[in-house]
């Protein structure tokens, strides 16, 4: 019996007369199916089992050169699709990771650099004054974090150039912006733990605001007990 899906003039006539139905469409391959075909191809080449966790680690961590080495005539199309997807992902990551350092800005730069930073951009602004040790400490920590989180824009400015007559007692100050809107602020030594603040603690604080994708989930800052409660407990212990 002739295949009704075969491309022949006779079948075209039968379809035109309504005697046979339209040619069945080829099933579209899904991304999951592409992933499965690719995993099967790689497994045949490496002879290593790929479970769900291993697949994510082994495939997604491959460089473009490693993907090139896996290509052969049978699997070239599948691997090429994945290769193009990886290129797109790398380009997207590179586009986001465009900062990587602490930039010095002036009051004139404030609007363009902070409030008009762009869609999806987090900005961490450090207001400082020269000669203030705590400001130097914050700057040191921010330099480390800027390298680790290049998708976040870290800037600093002499406080009085952005806000005239800004009180030095309120330094250092950190403002956190997202898409031009102020999301969080830390004003003065007390809120920033003075000279006890560590880079890990600052990372956690910025992460809580959403400014950096930190993996720190527990607050590393020491828990300070309420002084009044502690005094009451000390006094009550005198009776025993």
From Swiss-Prot:
Alphabetical list of SUPFAM superfamilies matching this protein: Thioredoxin-like (SSF52833)
Gene3D superfamilies named in the record: Glutaredoxin
InterPro entries assigned to the protein according to its UniProt record, in alphabetical order: Phosducin-like_chap/apop_reg (IPR051498), Phosducin_thioredoxin-like_dom (IPR024253), Thioredoxin-like_sf (IPR036249)
Entry keyword annotation includes Cytoplasm: yes
Primary localization class, coarse: cytoplasm
Keyword Iron: no
Phosphoserine modified-residue sites: 63, 73
Chain positions covered by the region annotation Thioredoxin fold: 99-240
Recorded superkingdom: Eukaryota
GO MF annotation terms: protein folding chaperone
GO annotation, cellular component aspect: cytoplasm; cytosol; endoplasmic reticulum
Residue ranges annotated for the Phosducin domain, each copy included: 54-214
UniProt keyword list: Apoptosis, Cytoplasm, Phosphoprotein
Pfam families: Phosducin
GO biological process: apoptotic process; chaperone-mediated protein folding; protein folding
Subcellular location: Cytoplasm
Family recorded in the similarity comment: Belongs to the phosducin family.
Stated role: Modulates the activation of caspases during apoptosis.
Name of this chain's protein: Phosducin-like protein 2
């Amino acid at each position: 019996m002739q295949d009704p899906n075969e491309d022949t003039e006779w079948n075209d006539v039968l379809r035109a007369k309504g005697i046979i139905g339209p040619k069945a469409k080829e099933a579209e391959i899904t991304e999951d199916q592409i992933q499965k075909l690719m995993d099967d191809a790689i497994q045949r080449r490496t002879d290593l089992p790929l479970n769900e966790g291993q697949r994510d680690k082994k495939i997604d961590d491959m460089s473009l050169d490693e993907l090139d080495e896996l290509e052969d005539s049978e699997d070239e199309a599948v691997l090429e699709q994945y290769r193009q997807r990886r290129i797109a992902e790398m380009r997207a990551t590179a586009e986001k990771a465009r900062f990587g350092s602490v930039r010095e800005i002036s009051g004139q730069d404030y609007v363009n650099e902070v409030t008009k930073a762009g869609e999806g951009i987090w900005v961490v602004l450090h207001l400082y004054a020269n000669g203030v040790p705590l400001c130097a400490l914050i700057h040191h920590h921010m330099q480390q974090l800027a390298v680790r989180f290049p998708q976040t824009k870290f800037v600093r400015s002499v406080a009085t150039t952005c806000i005239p007559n800004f009180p030095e007692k309120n330094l250092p100050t950190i403002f956190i912006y997202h898409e031009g809107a102020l999301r969080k602020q830390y004003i003065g030594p007390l809120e920033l733990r003075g000279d006890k603040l560590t880079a890990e603690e600052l990372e956690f604080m910025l992460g809580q605001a959403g400014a950096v994708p930190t993996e720190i989930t527990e607050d590393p800052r020491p828990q300070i007990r309420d002084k009044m409660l502690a005094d009451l407990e000390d006094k009550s212990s005198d009776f025993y």
